[in-house]
Structures are given as structure tokens and as C-alpha cells.
Amino acid sequence: MRDTVDPVFSLGISSLWDELRHMPTGGVWWVNADRQQDAISLVNQTIASQTENANVAVIGMEGDPGKVIKLDESHGPEKIRLFTMPASEKGLYSLPHDLLCSVNPTHYFFILICANNTWRNITSESLHKWLEKMNKWTRFHHCSLLVINPCNNSDKQSSLLMGEYRSLFGLASLRFQGDQHLFDIAFWCNEKGVSARQQLLLCQQDERWTLSHQEETAIQPRSDEKRILSHVAVLEGAPPLSEHWTLFDNNEALFNDARTAQAATIIFSLTQNNQIEPLARRIHTLRRQRGSALKIVVRENIASLRATDERLLLGCGANMIIPWNAPLSRCLTLIESVQGQQFSRYVPEDITTLLSMTQPLKLRGFQPWDTFCDAIHTMMSNTLLPADGKGVLVALRPVPGIRVEQALTLCRPNRTGDIMTIGGNRLVLFLSFCRVNDLDTALNHIFPLPTGDIFSNRMVWFEDKQISAELVQMRLLSPELWGTPLPLAKRADPVINAEHDGRIWRRIPEPLRLLDDTAERAS
């Protein structure tokens, strides 16, 4: 008996070449979509792109899939199987078993339409296990699974999936850009070969997805190493220095153009502190999705970066940060120095891990002795933080005549992450991410008086081993010697008999009697 040939299924985008369209049996493919309506439209055209006798099943998580799935009268199979499932982690793990109870999965094409943001509360470890399980299941039963995932943060989802190439045969995103759509292919593997890092413009007409005419003949760039994409503020008013330079008015436009780059130099501009987190997210997306050949530079045009912010940007994938006080000539020399570099540092797949580096201590001010020790121990154990750069531990002993509780009232830290405690007649401070050479400046900001007038002795620890060793000694202090702040004095606020006339406050006159009735009768 002649063996049957395994079918090859197709993604529902017309004019797309087979290397980016075919989905043979025995694999899992994943497409993120910015909008729910785009996801449904892509599913409908994907069904219409199959042969007449193809076995197709659609699994929906939200509502009745029969209300949104439409069969094309002239294309695709005459009938398909429809299933619903709960939008939960347990439902995902039981999916293979449930399908086996209903159909023989051999040579079937399963399309899973996820609910909006289904994967937000599912950990990356659980996602990895599920993909590994589905990969083995599709290979064993000679079937294919296409996951269509509508989500409002496709960049984050794509970054999490970039490392799943052993379980995923294809990963792409369908991005909505106002008047057009962009099909962003991270990687796609089938019987035609492997394609990666391609971006194609799509047109949607009459619910049909087609490749834009300009993309049908466009050649994907293979070597753009000489290109420099820069914010216009980086050159400080100077024109582009050569034909390789392209200037952009804002970081958003620069980021969108950099999505297609492979080895170019990308130069962002930073002028305000509130730009740091959005810029970090853009850098993380580019580094995770476009690879290690991309050179990413941040030019600080106005002083706005702290040491923790620099670590965040570098940890997200930036090659270099140019300080605000570097002249233009020095800036251009530094840009030239990154040419030909390959980014070699590890970038975590989830940016929230990196964002937690900026404020690992969500504490400020006085903490009980045990809470203080636990907080510093947690920080010392954080492997993502730089070695010997987590902060400074300072123990201060007050001069004779001043109690340590009184000295505590003068300690007024302003930064989150700066904490203190008292015990054993010492005031102990931990200044997160403070460099030891900046300690005196930091103490002058924290205390209103010179520290030499308040304290007679000071001990400092700034290396991780030193701080950890001192923590061991601090934990040996008995609770009876732990200090507590002085109680706040209760002062009754005087009641002011006044009213506001719309411009200023005016006191209300109160009538006073100089003599009471008894005194008047006596006279």
C-alpha cells in the first residue's frame, strides 16, 4: 500500500512566497496580531487558502467561533470543525487530550485563536513547557498548529518567543500602522528552508490579505552595516555627514525605521528623565528581535541619566551611552568606535526583569533592624545588579550628648532605596547605587548639619563581600538593642476663625463683653 504524502498548509496572505507561507505537518507556528479584527480576518483567509479536501479545525477562546469564522464559497474546504476552550492555563495543557477525544488529528490543520492578552498572566516557563508539549504532539500525529494571538503588546510577546525556535517552526507579527499593515517575520522554517528578520508591507482589500506591489520586487537588505539612523538632535543642527546618514525628528520614527535594520547604527537622543523607560523598551525590542549585529547608541543631549539609568539602557541592549558633556567631535569619534562590533552581553527576554534593576528596593527612610537586614540581603543576592556597585553601607556613632534616636530625626533621605535603622547606639544607612566617592555629597544632602558635628565615628562598606560580612554581624545583635524612633509630639493646631473672600483670608470679628450681667447689677 502506497504511503500518503503529508499535506502542506498555507498562511492566508496572497502573493507571499512559499518560504514565508508554507506550514508542513509536524510543526507549530505563531503569529501575533495588534488587533482582534486583523486576527479574525487572517484566520478566515488562511482557511480559504487551503485545498478543498483539507482537514481544518478552528479552536476559539472567546465566545462562539461560528459567529466570526466564515467559509469562502469558491475557495478552501467545504466544511471545518469548530471547537471552544477556556482561556486558562489548564485549558491549554488539556488541549491535546481534548482534541484526541473529538477527531483523529493525523493530517489536520488546527488554528488556535487566543483571547486578547491570554498569555499575560502565564509565565515564560509555562509557555516554554506548553510549546514543547505541542511540538511533540504535532510531530507524533503528523498535524500542524497555527496560533493566532491578538495582543496589545506584541513586542513583549515576540521577545519572549524569540528563544523558542526549538519548539516553534515560525514566529511573526501582524502590526497595524494606521493606513497599512506590516508583516514582521522573526523566523519561518518549512520544507523550502529558513527565513528570518524580514518585514513586508501588506494590503487588506475586501477582507483579503495581499503582499504590497512594492514588496513583490523589493530585495530584503542583507548588509546595511554602513547605514547610520540618527535622531536629528545628535548632530546639533549639522546636516547629514554622508549619504549613509538618515536623520529623524523623533525617537518613535527612528525606532520604526530601525525595525528593518540588521547591522546598522541606531542613535537615539535623550533629553528628559521621563524618556528613559520608553527608550529602554525600544532598545530591548530592537536587541531581542534584530540581533547582535545592530549597533545601538544613546546620546544624552541634556543631563538626565543616573548611574542606575545607564545600567538599565546598557542591560536592555545599548552598545554605548554618550554623556551630555561630550562635544560633537568626541560624539562622532565614539560613534565610529562601535562600527564592526558584535553585541555579546545577555539580554533577558522579559524587560520587567531589567526594569526592576532601577529600583530593587521599594523602601525609603527608617526600617526596623530585621527589615533593614533582609532588604539589603535581597539586594546583595540579586545577580542582575553589578558586582560591587549595589550601594554603600554606612554606620554612624553620634557624638557624646546626642542620643542615636535624636540623630535619627536629622536623617532625611529623599531617594527611594535609601534606608536607615538604629541599634547598638549606631545609625546605619544603606544608600543604594551610591558610589563610595560620592558618599560625602550624599550625606550632605541627607543631613541638614555637617556630619562631623553630629557623629564622632564613621565606618563604610562598599564591596559586596564587605557588606555581606557586616550583615552577618548585624543579625547577631539581640532584639533588645534594636532602636526605635522617638514618638512624634502631638501638637494641637490652633483653630483660626477666618474665611476666604475669594482673594485673601480674613479673620471674622468675635464680639466680647467687658462686663457680665452680675457685674452690671452689682454696680
Curated annotation (Swiss-Prot):
InterPro entries: BcsE. Disruption phenotype: Mutants lack the ability to produce a biofilm. GO terms for biological process: cellulose biosynthetic process; proteolysis. The keyword Ribonucleoprotein does not apply. Pfam families: CBP_BcsE. Keywords: Cellulose biosynthesis, Hydrolase, Nucleotide-binding, Protease. One of its GO terms (molecular function) is peptidase activity. It comes from the Bacteria. Required for cellulose biosynthesis. May have protease activity, but BcsA is not targeted. Binds bis-(3'-5') cyclic diguanylic acid (c-di-GMP). NCBIfam families: cellulose_bcsE, PRK15045.1. Belongs to the BcsE family. This is Cyclic di-GMP binding protein BcsE. It comes from Salmonella typhimurium (strain LT2 / SGSC1412 / ATCC 700720).
